[in-house]
Amino acid sequence: VKDSSYNLYEHLKIDNFSILPGSESKLLKGLELGCAGIITATCNVTAGLSRKVYDDFIEKKEPTKNKMLCDVRNAFEKFNLISGLHSFMSDEDEIYKNVLPPVSLLNEKDKIQLINELNKLNFTLGSSKVV
């Protein structure tokens, strides 16, 4: 089950039942608590980073990409997540400009702010690809 409230993943423990926090910022702690991973809209662009954090946890390595993963998520959280995702991805493929109400694309000022924040993190669609 997806836990967007962040109330379950720390407390609910049922055999053969997976809790998936709904934010990249909860991935590492969730894994430490026995969660199977995350389920989040922004994972469409953070999958590579999320996978690296997951793999490092499984392999008992230092989570070298967790801060960047959380920083990217935080950049998107400053706006409506779906609007931010579609606005970000629309530079690569115009199909992402198609959204249904009540969702809309970010206004130009907010889109520039989001892109600038992601650029400061050296995060691009190219860098987000799962290898």
Q: Predicted segment positions?
A:
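Conserved, mostly hydrophobic/aromatic
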Residues: 1, 30, 85, 114
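Flexible C-terminal active-site loop/helix
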Residues: 94-128
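Catalytic alpha/beta core domains of metabolic enzymes, predominantly
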Residues: 2-79
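A structural signal for alpha-helix termini and helix-coil/disorder junctions
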Residues: 56-59, 75-78, 91-94, 120-124
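Residue-level marker for well-ordered alpha-helical positions
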Residues: 24-25, 83, 112
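Conserved short secondary-structure transition element at the edge of the structured enzyme core
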Residues: 31-32, 68-104
